[in-house]
Amino acid sequence: PSCIMNQSLRAKLYESSIKACKAVNYVGAGTIEYLVDNDMNYYFMEMNTRIQVEHPVTEMVFGLDLIKNQILSHAQIPLPNWMKDIKIRGHAIECRVNAEDPSKSFMPSPGTISSFHMPGGNGIRVDTHAYAGYFVPQFYDSMIAKIIVHAPTRKEAIYRMSGALDECVVEGIKTTIPFLK
């Protein structure tokens, strides 16, 4: 969760988001983004009517399976009213591992991955399609993995992510791992 979020702001954002969805008859998984100023005033930025890349952070903190709920919603199967029972559980952080060279202004780093090891363990999730032998093409989406960590506190989540990044091994191409550390 955002380090500036409090219960009052969360409730206001929730109500505004519900109103926005009802106003356009939107049903399904999605994200509404807001900007918050120094006085805790919030401003609508955009609505994404799709699952976001960052959805694992929400899943870990709220204990929900957003993909499952999206499928149920599109199948017109009523979703449980989980908002009344939802509880925030700790903090989660996501780092995107990209095939880019941070020392060269994040230039693309195509090539064959010769060695590939991602972290694991309690509170660590890795979403990836890459593997040793995978060829990262020149014209591509540079993200090769997402590392998501969950812990009881923000400080512990940062510590867990630091350890997870230290466990990563990607050889044969340059990645953003050194930058993320």
Kindly give the residue locations of the regions a language model identified:
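ATP-dependent carboxylate activation and anion-phosphoryl transfer catalytic cores
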Residues: P1-K181
